[in-house]
Swiss-Prot record:
GO cellular component: plasma membrane
EC numbers for this chain: 3.6.1.27
Xref: Pfam families: BacA (PF02673)
Natural source organism: Bacillus anthracis
Biological role: Catalyzes the dephosphorylation of undecaprenyl diphosphate (UPP). Confers resistance to bacitracin.
Similarity remark: Belongs to the UppP family.
GO MF terms held by the record: undecaprenyl-diphosphatase activity
Membrane-crossing segments per the record: 17-37, 42-62, 83-103, 106-126, 142-162, 183-203, 216-236, 242-262
This protein's record includes keyword Ubl conjugation: no
Protein name: Undecaprenyl-diphosphatase 2
Amino acid sequence: MADWLIGIIMGAVEGLTEFLPVSSTGHMILTGHLIGFDDDRAKVFEVVIQLGSILAVVVIFWKRLWSLVGIGKVTDGPSLNLLHIIIGMIPAGVLGVLFHSAIKEVLFGPGPVVISLVAGGILMIVAEKFSKPSTARTLDEITYKQAFTIGMFQCLALWPGFSRSGSTISGGLLARVSHTAAAEYTFILAVPMMVAASGLDLIKSWDILSTADIPLFATGFITAFVVAMLAIVSFLKLLSRVKLTPFAYYRFILAAVFYFFIM
């Protein structure tokens, strides 16, 4: 298959699934397997196109991101600030640094991904069933305690297949944060976390990179960016009408497909 087509297909899958609670890792592994793109180059490619998805968040939430560092103000009252983000980053950041190699060796495989797809789906159903009325209906109403709770749930996203948004939105619901506010916080929180993780992976995989792969990486990056933009905007609108449960059932189906076609 031509590199440009691989770039478009994989970039579209990454952009569509990175911020939905369905596991981008599971979809990337499955798609790569189906089109025969699953070598060492593919691993570096996935890191690069993740940056395209991150750029989509930066573009959509640029005013909010500027306000976090004291440039501009999105509301006259109390608002989300940089400390909310730092608090949310600490749990997964610490675990990620301490156990980065172990996570890559133990959890990056078909078996662990199938388990996490199912476990993540169950978590989402439980969160919907046992969540109480929201005390934080907007992003600016999130407390430091709620930010820390969401950050703790983000630790689950270190397990490939669990889904960052699925884990953190579920944590937000259990901490009495609304669906939309939890999702928006999740997307903003993902920017520093994913940049750090992708940067670390790129440094460790630098010797695999080749100038011959630039067209492939560029195509995937641009595709992931465009599709992620559309996916984020659509998902935020959808959350006001549809809860996490349908995504949980989809994860169960994906786990079955993964089990029969990959394992």
